């Protein structure tokens, strides 16, 4: 793979990762409520789900999912329901205990939240299936190129989520107690909204 092709892939990945999807909203909501550590752990969960979808795309499992609308909907609705549940809990706690900081999730829970938020978007497997052939050159080892693209994709996603978490946490730290309570509600609302948006998502027809 040429350096030019790799740079184009990284540029496309970076722009797409900047889009505020469920994983961005989850990590930002955790960071904006003061749980920076949980936000970083949730990022690992997101990357784990991404790695799974990337591997599935390489193995050709997109064809299996594409003919099974039931499998797509099950994954989507489970993820959407989970995001709506934790978002609602955050909002309820913020209203019922306005002076108290939100309870930080355990590392395992934060990891699972990140994984579910990303895994709830099965369209990722179609995206990877569509974009990989555009950058894998037939003159070089396909597996090495796929490995480079996969590692690059995860690194870019991790960097973008880390930057979102840093910015959100900085806003939280610079706020007054009153504003922090508002941010707690905003964080819950972000998750609630992302769950609703996810439930409205339709299966991609063009792989992107």
What are these regions (language model features)?
Residues 9, 38-41, 56, 75-76, ...:
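Small-residue packing motifs within transmembrane alpha-helices
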Residues 56-58, 119-129, 191-205:
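Hydrophobic alpha-helical transmembrane segments in multi-pass integral membrane proteins
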Residues 48-52, 111-124, 187:
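Select subsegments of transmembrane alpha-helices in polytopic membrane proteins
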Residues 67-96, 154-160, 164, 174-208:
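Selective transmembrane alpha-helices of multi-pass membrane proteins
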Residues 15, 19, 116-123, 155-159:
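Residue-level hotspots within pore-lining transmembrane alpha-helices
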Residues 92-109:
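Flexible cytoplasmic inter-helical loops of multi-pass small-molecule transporters
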Residues 3-73, 130-149, 154, 165-168:
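Juxtamembrane transmembrane-helix termini in multi-pass membrane transport proteins
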Residues 1-5, 205-208:
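Short, strongly hydrophobic alpha-helical membrane anchors
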